[in-house]
């Protein structure tokens, strides 16, 4: 019953945040499986003891924050994941904030004329700017595709 409330809240609001909560790897996987089949992010190393979890880690030499610009997770996949489940294990002494915006709320706040115009648009999706995919045996030129601007 509690998980159904979580699902309902996610569909209603587009995001759920549980601040200062520890989520064990086992519980992380259990929660993810509740929403459907787990799609492990191919750009990050799976956790050895829990290969259904991808570890997003910044190295000490890294100057750019991973996903540091506005983005939608996995929009470059032909069938994007329904949601992402993140659990911060280490936080920097400052920063590290994640901000969220609802494209659905923005769309429904627009005039019907602007909505009609946007419905006709298509978007080009690619993972090429996200990571140097060639190091992973993935050819970015094979991945871009055009989709309606609104997926869901």
Q: Which stretches of residues belong to each language-model region?
A:
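Non-heme Fe(II) oxygenase catalytic core, chiefly the N-lobe of the double-stranded beta-helix
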Residues: 1-152
């Amino acid at each position: 019953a509690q998980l159904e409330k979580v699902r309902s809240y996610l569909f209603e609001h587009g995001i759920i945040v549980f601040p200062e909560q520890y989520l064990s790897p086992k519980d992380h996987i259990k929660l993810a499986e509740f929403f459907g089949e787990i799609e492990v992010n191919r750009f990050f190393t799976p956790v050895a003891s829990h290969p259904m979890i991808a570890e997003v880690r910044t190295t000490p030499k890294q100057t750019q924050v991973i996903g540091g610009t506005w983005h939608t997770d996995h929009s470059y996949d032909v069938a994007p994941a329904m949601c992402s489940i993140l659990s911060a294990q280490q936080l920097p002494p400052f920063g590290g904030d994640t901000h969220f915006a609802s494209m659905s709320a923005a769309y429904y706040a627009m005039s019907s004329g602007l909505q009609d115009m946007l419905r006709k648009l298509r978007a080009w999706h690619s993972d090429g700017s996200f990571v140097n995919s060639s190091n992973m045996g993935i050819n970015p030129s094979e991945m871009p595709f055009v989709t309606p601007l609104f997926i869901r």
